[in-house]
């Protein structure tokens, strides 16, 4: 079931409601969150900001996204519109995953639109694929 969320303050209550629904279903569930990372900085700036955004997500601590945002958005980087396009979606999925037992985040791939052979490097969009999982004990 697709759910769109655009306000960070909804991450906690939405995550809690989804976890409650998952527990009540007694089914195996895969939760997927989707968003872009940086929007429109230069290639080099995007690499730095995206790396920090990825590290914040890998921490499994949604608050680190807020700290990372304050740091980068306060620097006045030209054309940097956001560090994580839908931070609300990311925070919601982080909360769901942790509530369901995720204790590890694994970076699968990170890149930006400037990485393709015909990629324009003056203004790029960042991307990453990250799995939030429970390590086998």
Please describe what each predicted stretch is.
Residues 1-30, 40-137:
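Flexible, D/E/H-enriched segments
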Residues 34:
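Generic enzyme active-site microenvironment
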Residues 37:
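Active-site metal-binding loops of divalent metal-dependent hydrolases
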